[in-house]
Amino acid sequence: AGGQDLTSVATITQSQVSTADFTTRASGVVSGLHVVAAVLEYCGVNHYEVLVDEGAKVSAGKVLITAQGNTQKILLAERTALNFLSHLSGISTLTNQWVSEISGTKCQIRDTRKTTPGLRMLEKFAVRMGGGVNHRLSLSQAALIKDNHIMAAGSISDAFNAIKKMYPDKSIEIEVDSIDQLKEAITLKPDLILLDNMSTDQCSEAVSITNGLVKLEASGGIAITNAKAYAATGVDYLAIGSLTHSAPALDIGLDFRKGK
């Protein structure tokens, strides 16, 4: 934004220098440190030290980054840097909670395209730092045939064959919401089938029917409280939209050192 930081300009001399620490107020999994570094540099703070790795599990009170430089410039960077760091670390922390919940199964936690506009790549990075895996990064990376595509194309087979003809080398995933649709989808030999809003019993049946011929992803109606039950059905992935659209920010603050 244009203009000045009125508060800092009025209360702090241009020559004042300080040392400040980005410190966690709660335990979690950290991500977005490289974004903080970019924000600091953009604001003219070039002396800083990153003290932990991306994806590190930290406790409350951990210093993540120490910055030293012009006090006005540090304060200019503060909120933007913290917004990125808290948001992305919140995603990593929530993802790690889901990953821990289904430990001991072969299932993996995946994100979705339900990301904040403009922040998709950063949010998907945060998911990886939390131990999750990414779904497609863009509409052009792979095809996902959903209910609206099926409705528009006429059938699952029509939609699949049209994509296969135009993009023979692209991965194709088919969304199904019934066992009957699943049986039709299997005959097409897609790379992945998404089981939409199916119960754990239906997911178990789907695993039995496919018998390893195609990877399965469950989505919809899954909470962290029943994640282990879904993972235990034998599906390969749980697709969790809340990782990116509902993750609470990790509490992180910026503290100036006294006398410095």
Predicted regions and their residues:
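Acidic/glycine-rich phosphate/pyrophosphate-binding loops and surrounding catalytic core
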Residues: A1-L188, L192, D201-I209, E217, ...
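Short secondary-structure boundary segments
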Residues: N197, G220, S242-L243
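Short acidic, glycine/proline-enriched helix-loop-strand junctions
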Residues: G212-K215, K258-G259
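Cys/His-rich Zn2+-binding cysteine-cluster or related metal-binding knuckle/ribbon modules and their
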Residues: I224
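Short, charged, intrinsically disordered terminal tails
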Residues: S242-K260
